[in-house]
Amino acid sequence: MKPIGPLMWEHRLIEKMLSFFEAATRKINEKNKVDPLFIDTAVDFIRTYADRTHHGKEEDILFRDLIKKQLSQEHARIMEELVEEHKYARNKVGMLVDAKERYLKGGNTSQEIVVLLNELARFYPIHIEKEDKHFFYPCMDYFTKEEQARMLQEFFEFDRNMIHEKYRTVVDRIEAQSV
């Protein structure tokens, strides 16, 4: 299996999660009420799965190794765009958290939340298509079969460590709140 296999599987789960955003925005528009639990769950999914786990493998492993190669101008440009797009998504998620917090304090941010959910739901499919159809496959040509096998193993190790990282952070946050 090529190392892009797990990345593309992760894309399918991200797309599935995003498919729930439309129903969430419809409910907000119908009831003029935000479900903070849905927002928290969506944010946790995007931050932990889409960003830290998925984008982490891309940036910390795939892109790190690609930088060492003689990339074509097109592939170098696309990789730079992808990094900027990851930053864009992080920013939008931060804005979503901020809007939800203001909502919980009585702010009228329901439409801001709708806009942010819609922006994320529009952004990710385009970003995913760019990776799946224009970047991942051609980039594998820069690596030998042995390099690809090592990268795949590094992806698996990265995933194994993620659960520990996530819950270490949870415990640290609870500890900080209890002091």
Language model features by range: what are they?
Residues 1-179:
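Small-residue-biased structural context
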